[in-house]
Amino acid sequence: NDIRHNLSKLHRNIEQVAAAGAQLVVLQELHNTSYFCQTEDTDMFDLAEPVPGPSTGFYSELAAGYGIVLVTSLFEKRAPGLYHNTAVVFDKDGSIAGKYRKMHIPDDPAYYEKFYFTPGDLGFEPIQTSLGKLGVQVCWDQWYPEGARLMALKGAEILIYPTAIGCLLYTSPSPRDISG
């Protein structure tokens, strides 16, 4: 969980895609670190930060510096004992256009997110940006269609789900490894 290394890598990658003409950049779920929710570890709470906070300052500068709309996913510490998996959207000028706190929190052998996160309380409100209205939710929320429906009914033009699914490390061969 080398945050400085991850931020440096994210900065380089954002710079690359912005130079290639990207206007909207969506980072994966909980991108400041590797996905830590596969175990229950109280030390991981040290990774949480307020919103706004250090990471939002960093991403605000990137959005403004490259003139992009940027969607991030952060481990938010809202208050002592109150933590969220929060998507924060930055407009092209670096301002925080809005945020969404993940509502559907998985808890199974691969995802111990209920150990870390409280379900969100901000509802399903599209976020107005210079590119249009974004319907932002986070990962597991995509399996519950009512959020997408409510966002669309309220005018969302694009649905976005930062997700960590697909970046998990396999302990057995992946289907690609055994397909021959």
Can you describe what each PLM-predicted range is?
Residues L7-I14, E146-A148:
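Short, acidic/polar
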Residues I3, R12-K92, K99, G166-S172:
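Cys-nucleophile CN-hydrolase/nitrilase-fold catalytic domain and related Cys-dependent amidase chemistry
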Residues G67-I68, G132, R176:
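Generic structural signal for secondary-structure transition and capping sites
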Residues Y170-G180:
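Single conserved hydrophobic/aromatic residue that forms the stacking wall/gate
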Residues Y35, I105-D108, G180:
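Conserved protein kinase catalytic core
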Residues D41, P145, G180:
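Loop/helix-junction capping segments adjacent to catalytic residues or to phosphate/diphosphate-binding pockets
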Residues E49-V51, R78-I158, P162-S172:
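Active-site catalytic loop in hydrolytic enzyme cores
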